[in-house]
Structures are given as structure tokens and as C-alpha cells.
């Protein structure tokens, strides 16, 4: 069993984390936490770099833009905040009418999508953020996760407590619904842009990233909160209700290893961009960085 680097600093459950793309300075981790203080860390060793100060409520999601120059956080204080990762300053704050659970950058970094307990998706232009470009209704319960298609900045995907993944065409306003058996807990695209990885209930599903046809569905013996596919597509990690981070063979679904250490359910997990490590965040308030993949 591998021994993780334990990244302390948060005082309440860690709700989300993301790795940046690699650049000349390496990679970084941004974490969201119910303590309201998102943190920036070195992606190689987990060392704390800084804390983004300004939220007045729990922070539910955290994302980098493609160059790692900015970070985006969504909060229970009814705001989405854009941060400068170099100096930690708040660039702008986008007001909402209720708790915001998710926010993500478009591929070209010019727009963001947000969603939360209002059950409404909003699209904002970061050059003119005072009013949304679009407001999209259709979800019947809280939106927990939303992201942009890696192949088309006019396509947005969202999922949440209504047990449906919705694929929205922003040009026409039409949607396609992919039904799940349980609430959608996480959603990410693979590094090579071939797969969409989603979790719901005890299932991890791998979809074709262009046709959105389900290619593989693996049922696991615990409720899954998160999953991430290795950059070479050989294996995936999953975490959830049993406190452990599991590693599975992508082709067969067979379990390769179990990583124990968290003292609460695993809320989020991601592979590093080079695949040499993965990070997990938990209800126990810690981030653990697992090396040597």
C-alpha cells in the first residue's frame, strides 16, 4: 500500500480539487473546502502556496483555466469568484441568487458555466460578467457538476440530483438527456479527449466524448463520489463512501490496488496531468497526494 503525502490546512471537508495543466513551473492543485478558503498547492509535492480569501460560505468547486493563470470557485455565499493565481487577488465576483455548486471555464477561457441549487445553468462572458449570456432551465433538482465539451465550446454538459446528464447545445438551446440510476456526483473528460467519465450511485461510466454513447459501465461495491482516468487510459481511480481510493484496470474493471488513509468518505480525486500521481480530498478535511503510479 502506497504512503501518501498528507496536505493539511483545511479545517472542514474538502469538496473538490483540480490539477492544472503542466507549464514551465510544473503543475498546481486548487482545492475547494467547506471552510470557505480555497487553497493553491504545488502539484508535485502538495506544498501550500496560498489561500484565496474572500468567500463568506462553503466552497463547492474549484477549477483552473488552461494556462493555470486563473482559478474559478463556486460557493454557498451565492457567488462564483475568479482569482489571479500568481498573486492570489480576486479578479471578479459573479453574483447568483442561491448556492452555487459548480463552475468551469470554457476551452478558450473566455466564458464560464455555473450551476447550483437554483437548478439553472448560466453562461457568462468574462469580459462582460455583470449579466449572463444565457440562462438555461431544465434540471428539476440541484445541479452538482457542469463542464464544457472538450470538442466544442458551444456544448455544455451538466448533472446533479435529478439523476440525468444533460447535454446542451448553446446555439440552438436544445438538449439531449442521458439517464442515470442515481444522482450525478462527478464528471470529467479524459486527457486525450476520447472519454467522458461520470459517477452516479455505485457506477462509473465511460462515454464516447463525441457521440456520448456509453462504452463501459463498472459497478463498484460502494457509493462512488468521484473517478478519474489515467492519462494513458490504462487504469482509473475511484473514491467514495468506504474512505478508500481504489485503482482499477480500465479494460477489465478489475481492482488493482486499494489505498487506505482517509478517515472519512472520499469526495474528490484526480490524476495529475503526467499520470505520475493522484490526489484525493475527503470529508476528513485532508488532501492526500499519492505518488508512484
UniProtKB/Swiss-Prot annotation:
It comes from the Eukaryota. One of its GO terms (biological process) is spliceosomal snRNP assembly. GO terms for cellular component: SMN complex. WD repeats lie at residues 9-53, 54-93, 95-134, 138-178, 180-217, 219-258, 261-293. GO terms for molecular function: RNA binding. Keywords: mRNA processing, mRNA splicing, Repeat, WD repeat. It holds the Pfam family WD40. InterPro entries: G-protein_beta_WD-40_rep (IPR020472), TIF_beta_prop-like (IPR013979), WD40/YVTN_repeat-like_dom_sf (IPR015943), WD40_repeat_CS (IPR019775), WD40_repeat_dom_sf (IPR036322), WD40_rpt (IPR001680). Part of the core SMN complex. PANTHER family: EUKARYOTIC TRANSLATION INITIATION FACTOR 3 SUBUNIT I, SERINE-THREONINE KINASE RECEPTOR-ASSOCIATED PROTEIN. Belongs to the WD repeat STRAP family. The SMN complex catalyzes the assembly of small nuclear ribonucleoproteins (snRNPs), the building blocks of the spliceosome, and thereby plays an important role in the splicing of cellular pre-mRNAs. Most spliceosomal snRNPs contain a common set of Sm proteins SNRPB, SNRPD1, SNRPD2, SNRPD3, SNRPE, SNRPF and SNRPG that assemble in a heptameric protein ring on the Sm site of the small nuclear RNA to form the core snRNP (Sm core). This is Serine-threonine kinase receptor-associated protein.
